[in-house]
Amino acid sequence: MNFAELAAFAGRNPILSSALAGLTLAILGMEAMRLLRGGHRLAPAALTALVNREDALVLDVRVAADFEKGHIPGAKQLALAEVKPEHKLLAMAKSRPVVLVCKAGQSAEGAASMLRKAGFERVFVLDGGIDGWQQAGLPLAKGR
């Protein structure tokens, strides 16, 4: 399909063309916002490797009740509102990789950006959050 055919199609189908353009802009906008917030994403398998090779600190930023129902083995629970560079868990881990985990991988991005601005060099957000972890078939620990 050349440009002339594409333009003719768009002229014959203005609603469909507008919807496609709108969706494309929305996707590009969301990706730009994600990058501007500083959310370096980490796949579940890469998280396992990072913990094993570099002793990454995994912080689950969900509420305590959700954490107790199921969390990544070895993760520490720290409510999203408490994620501050001076918190004792984070102050000791400034030179380590830090991975933030939320439910679906969205709400942790703001905290990741804040930590990066505070000088934490290796901050990641688990792609897909705890839901992505489960979809990858990886185990959860229960309780505290």
Where are the regions a protein language model picked out?
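Rhodanese-like catalytic fold shared by cysteine-dependent sulfurtransferases
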Residues: 1-46, 50-56, 64-97, 103-144
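Conserved beta/loop motifs at nucleotide-recognition and modification sites
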Residues: 59
